[in-house]
Amino acid sequence: MTLDLHDYVASIQDFPEKGVTFRDISPLMENGEAYRQATNAIIKFARDKGVEMIVGPEARGFIVGCPVAYEMGIGFAPARKKGKLPRETVKATYGLEYGKSELYLQKDAIKPGQKVLITDDLLATGGTIAATIELVEKLGGIVVGTAFFIELKDLNGREKIKDYDTLSLMEY
């Protein structure tokens, strides 16, 4: 039976601030069949692309990417905030509404020429994912696609990653 994954996303009005509708994937993760269906769709996308490594940005990219990597029998590399990774890293800086942020990836996480899929729970403005792509490419990896549970179409995040094949399971 195919579930409508939209039924497993809670829409919270005025969170984290007035005028924002927060899309909460907790109900999806709390339902084994919905989580499995979403994960399996990304696994199929990854297999079709010959993916050899998954990279996900902190923290919800881990929730999406780890089960995909596990099921495929491949590795997962976390892109993390400053001070969270113990070995030598590369850095990418990206803009936020009020300032800048940084993501890091350990230098030995990606092999040159390795086919990489980047996963996250949600594509909004595209800044975090563009920074994650930059990290992978600095290390010589080939980003063969990006995959998300949710895409917020009005924020035009896909424009920042338009050169990459992108899978979004749900759009709002």
From Swiss-Prot:
To which species is this protein native? Pediococcus pentosaceus (strain ATCC 25745 / CCUG 21536 / LMG 10740 / 183-1w)
Keyword RNA-binding, does the record have it?
Answer: no
The annotated pathway is: Purine metabolism; AMP biosynthesis via salvage pathway; AMP from adenine: step 1/1
Q: Which PANTHER family match?
A: ADENINE PHOSPHORIBOSYLTRANSFERASE
Family affiliation: Belongs to the purine/pyrimidine phosphoribosyltransferase family.
Q: What does this protein do?
A: Catalyzes a salvage reaction resulting in the formation of AMP, that is energically less costly than de novo synthesis.
Keyword match Transferase: yes
Q: State the compartments where it is located.
A: Cytoplasm
What GO cellular component term, any one, is given? cytoplasm
Q: Which HAMAP family match?
A: Aden_phosphoribosyltr
Q: Which CDD domains match?
A: PRTases_typeI (cd06223)
Q: What does the subunit section of this Swiss-Prot or TrEMBL entry state? A: Homodimer.
Q: What is its main location?
A: cytoplasm
Q: What is this protein called?
A: Adenine phosphoribosyltransferase
Q: Which GO terms describe its molecular function?
A: adenine binding; adenine phosphoribosyltransferase activity; AMP binding
Its BP terms in the Gene Ontology are:
adenine salvage; AMP salvage; purine ribonucleoside salvage
Q: Name one Pfam family in it.
A: Pribosyltran
Catalytic activity, per the record?
Answer: AMP + diphosphate = 5-phospho-alpha-D-ribose 1-diphosphate + adenine
**Key words, A-Z:** Cytoplasm, Glycosyltransferase, Purine salvage, Transferase
Per the UniProt record, which EC number(s) apply here? 2.4.2.7
SUPFAM superfamilies referenced in this protein's UniProt entry, alphabetically: PRTase-like
Top EC group: transferase
